[in-house]
Amino acid sequence: MPTPEQVTPNSHRIALGIEYDGSTYSGWQKQKFPQQETVQQYLETAISKVADRDVVVSCAGRTDAGVHATCQVVHFDTEIDRGTKAWTEGVNSMLPRTIRVVWSRAQEDDFHARFSALSRRYMYLMYRRDTQSAMLHRRASYFRRELDEVSMHAAAQHFLGEQDFTSFRAAGCQSKTAMRNVMHANIYRRGGFLIFDVKANAFLQHMVRNMMGSLLQVGSGDKDPAWIGELLSLQDRSLAAPTALPDGLYLVGVEYPQVCALPSEISQPDLLLAI
């Protein structure tokens, strides 16, 4: 069977926009042991049923266990000619309710969900109150202490630009380089939530959660905003704060060249903000 990058003469490439609640999954990537349920595992099984043969998908960004996505993008190759509804409604009928295909688009053979992407955007949602919320369990991160969003936003500006993010990568990160280009990094409040909104050309493993973990130390008054700049310069993960929980992290956008004609985001009802 050809890999997603080895297109046969009779095959064509399809891109899908996916959203999922990652609460119960062991991340995006298919694992060695099938009892570790992943988003990729369920999606490939569903697409393969519609395509009448085994299908392998490639994604824009591999999310960790417990991380959600409102705009994941994948691609796969198939020799079966199906309409748009087959790749959306047909695949959705085979998926658990926590995973949904939102759109499908035919693409040129050189399109790649990961390597064609210009940027990815994540949002991290937090809330503060005396007790944890039952309604927001695993959908937003809980922090009991008061946070100074002005200091956190000032600290986040140290992330901007192209630089080495060794201090904010996971110990097991397999990327060959820690250089990444952060295009925006904003902290703001909306509807009772504190939101970290960050966009970059690509992200290292655990990078957003590690950034958030250190920003929380600034927001709680334990560190000054300039500390983030110092961490970047020192390039030592052990000096930064612990990794923030995955609960409030969402992949919310993937940007591609205009020629691909793909949505960069998926419109969402502001459910969390309406509660």
Can you say where each PLM-predicted feature lies in the sequence?
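Structured-RNA-binding interfaces characteristic of tRNA pseudouridine synthases
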Residues: 1-275
